[in-house]
Amino acid sequence: MEHFDVAIIGLGPAGSALARKLAGKMQVIALDKKHQCGTEGFSKPCGGLLAPDAQRSFIRDGLTLPVDVIANPQIFSVKTVDVAASLTRNYQRSYININRYAFDLWMKSLIPASVEVYHDNLCRKIWREDDKWHVIFRADGWEQHITARYLVGADGANSMVRRYLYPDHQIRKYVAIQQWFAEKHPVPFYSCIFDNAITDCYSWSISKDGYFIFGGAYPMKDGQTRFTTLKEKMSAFQFQFGKAVKSEKCTVLFPSRWQDFVCGKDNAFLIGEAAGFISASSLEGISYALDSAEILRSVLLKQPEKINAAYWHATCKLRLKLFGKIVKSRCLTAPALRKWIMRSGMAHIPQLKD
């Protein structure tokens, strides 16, 4: 059986970034359930907006986005809607509108050939034995068994690695539901929607390449019903839908306490959403995926004696930032406080009317 220095499970932004950064420095194997190219396979429900912090990560790495990853149009404000209060405000934001699936495949394409990458595979089992991590996965129609000194869980909200390391760990989860429609709005826009009767998280919309995408994060039990109810409510705010072209669904984490951030143990590490590194106030996770990958790269290459403790300490600033997002989320989802902020007009940019 083949042995590696590092086995990475999952090649979203976090896993792809780490694999790229370790290439040529350590012997790495990376496993991913997405296809290598094309439009088939798993596509994560995501508004597809690249936040300024994520943009800074690309500046740091000297990377530029290819044109086929960038979506049209580029929107410079977010229309914030409080459904219960019937309030709408416009706030300036500096996001880059991207095609999320194309972005994920592009990130994978940057991984050098020295990394052994398996696409469209199923990781079936992991365990630790004789100071090694064992991984069994199915690829190309047959099962393979490898070992690694270090195991990295970059496998998102339903992380197999996190469940193995922390079987009793509980974190709030929501179902993210998103539908695509033919664009009917005369002026494209991006929106953030709050309705506490529907969800204590939030919903969103984005215009992208001739489509209007509407989605949100809802309680697991009756998420589809709540999503449908909110769609009906949004007609009062001039949202236009029609027949859905495509529907997407996945689990999303919603950290609500300091203990929700878990970094790993026993030479296993968690990065990105698998570690709980996702903003509770916006559900933005790409920037934290890239940052945690960079932090772990540095730790792995330095090889400190207590390597898991070193990673835990190195992510302290990141975790504090994310804890601040939890506090911000509680403010944004508190109806009275949100209503007061929006009515105050702070940072609101009124749109001129003809």
Swiss-Prot record:
Pfam families, A to Z: FAD_binding_3 (PF01494)
SUPFAM superfamilies to which the protein is assigned, alphabetical: FAD/NAD(P)-binding domain
Molecular function terms, GO-annotated: FAD binding
Family according to the record: Belongs to the CbrA family.
UniProt name for this protein: Protein CbrA
Species in which this protein is naturally found: Shigella dysenteriae serotype 1 (strain Sd197)
Name of the gene encoding the protein in the UniProt record: cbrA
